[in-house]
A protein has these predicted regions:
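Intrinsically disordered, low-complexity, compositionally biased regions/tails
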Residues: 7-8, 26, 276
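Bacterial N-terminal signal peptides
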Residues: 13-25
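Residue-level detector of intrinsically disordered, flexible termini
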Residues: 5, 17, 27-29, 58
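OB-fold and OB-like single-stranded nucleic-acid-recognition modules
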Residues: 30-317
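Bacterial N-terminal signal peptides that target proteins for export
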Residues: 2-16
Length: 317
């Protein structure tokens, strides 16, 4: 009975917040406008990763402490992206060789081959306009206004760091309920164009989230990983939070290895980070005439699964 009361309070709180937010126009919140080339959207909409010729402008001197997420932040530029980029190595203290390579390249204008999950998310976009292909000057900070990340990084030149895609010991990730409710109610507007598509949205935040993933289908193999629709459950009580959200698994990572042979109904206890779902952006833009209402639906997002917890938490579902 107590658990049911908690669930009712949680649902009511989220509903009330959604109603209050719904009365506010998109412009009432700090907006970020993201203009992407349609060719880029189509190329990467069903891919897990990107490989970029990356110029390291500015990096953290050392990784964040585990309590703050354990990442190493690296600001830079790449012709394949054409936007301000922050690359992030997860659990960076565990790969000192990779950290050293970043610092060796920092400020030299020497490009390195950097691969990892592409991520577009409005956590650090500011009240800004991000236009793909706009000329960029070198950055003097490791955290410029940006919406594009290569996060997590999986490879630097010939050095693999795929083993860093794992839970962050000593870090408290966001709980599934509040994190996914934030993602679900974030507003957006898509403006289709002949060669570009613009997405206008607000800061979403809620970076790392821990949850139980229940597959709605068997995973689909793509060039650089796996994609699968899944339901999201709370870790503590197994409560259903979100139905049918796309999950992204990076080739060579522990989560990808765990999910690849699973079937519908399979469950994993995971750590994830959200990103804008370019497949949904593409669909909404293509169907603008038939479904104009879709251009103002809530933010299209998916989850990159970046860590696997090995326990029996799935028994709570």
């Amino acid at each position: 009975m107590q658990g049911r009361s908690v669930s009712v309070v949680r649902i009511f709180s989220v509903f009330l917040f959604a109603v209050l937010v719904g009365f506010l126009p998109l412009g009432a919140w700090a907006e970020t406008s993201i203009t992407l080339k349609n060719t880029f959207i189509e190329k990467y909409k069903n891919r897990a990763t990107i490989t970029a010729s990356f110029t390291v402008d500015k990096a953290h001197k050392k990784p964040n402490p585990a309590s703050k997420d354990g990442d190493l932040h690296i600001a830079g530029r790449a012709p394949e992206v054409g936007l301000p980029i922050v690359a992030e190595i997860m659990n960076a203290a565990s790969v000192p060789q990779a950290v050293a390579r970043i610092h060796e390249a920092e400020g030299t204008d020497r490009e390195i081959s950097l691969a990892g999950a592409w991520r577009i998310w409005t956590e650090h976009g500011g009240d800004s306009e991000q236009i793909q292909g706009k000329k960029l000057a070198p950055f003097t900070t490791s955290n410029p206004d940006h919406v594009f990340e290569i996060h997590p990084v999986t490879k630097l030149d010939d050095l693999s760091v795929a083993e860093t895609l794992k839970p962050i010991a000593g870090y408290k990730a966001k709980d599934a309920g509040p994190a996914f409710h934030r993602y679900e109610i974030t507003k957006s507007q898509i403006i289709p164009g002949k060669t570009t598509t613009t997405l206008v949205t607000n800061m979403a935040g809620f970076n790392y989230v821990e949850f139980l993933l229940e597959l709605s289908e068997a995973p689909h193999k793509v060039e650089d990983g796996y994609l699968a629709k899944a339901a999201v459950h709370d870790v503590d009580d197994g409560e259903l939070v979100v139905r049918n959200r796309r999950m992204v698994f990076v080739e060579g990572s522990a989560p990808a290895q765990a999910v690849k042979d699973m079937k519908e109904g399979g469950c994993l206890h995971v750590l994830g980070i959200p990103r804008i779902d370019l497949a949904l952006v593409s669909w909404r833009a293509r169907n603008a005439k038939a479904r104009p209402d879709a251009l103002r639906w809530s933010l299209p997002y998916e989850i990159i699964v970046v860590g696997l917890y090995k326990d029996n938490a799935c028994e709570r579902i």
